[in-house]
Amino acid sequence: MSASSIKMNKYRVWEYWSLLNSTGQNERASIHDDYLSPELLWFGPHPINSITGSAALEHCFYQPLFHAFPDLQRKTDIFLSGNFRGKEWISATGYFIGTFTHDWLGIPASGKIAYIRFGQFSRIDEGKIVETRILLDLIDLMRQVGIHVLPQSRGTEWVVPGPQSKDGVLLSEQDPAASRKSLELVESMIFGL
């Protein structure tokens, strides 16, 4: 897996997400065909849990999501890529932002702008997304509509900002040594606890 392959795959995912931000339901199926493996493995929040296939992803995730938030946009704050255990991965965090007009996943609509924080990891093979794991902050979405399932925070509950320098979206190649050092630091924080 060369640096140019990783860079190309990163651009493919960025392009896919950009197209999802600017197209409607009728165009999404062909976009999925261009960027997703037909055997895509998708893992997300309950009650969706897991989805197999790009057509099922549209039916089970995107259609209900865009129905609930018709003007939904993805705002990515951090976007990076690299190899992990011999596989190419793209990872990102940010927010889905849109007007919550219809209930979604049993959460009642507020009619107001909502922010759904996401963390997403997508594995790429031969230019297609073959696996996605996405974390959605549904507890915070529930808080935004007035449902408190956790004790009230002692701090401010609001949008977690991206990097102040606005340089969290890395579309260009990065120094492999610096990338490896960053990965080792993160893994030591995760696995060293």
Go through the PLM ranges and name each one.
Residues M1-L193:
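C-terminal and inter-domain tail/linker signature
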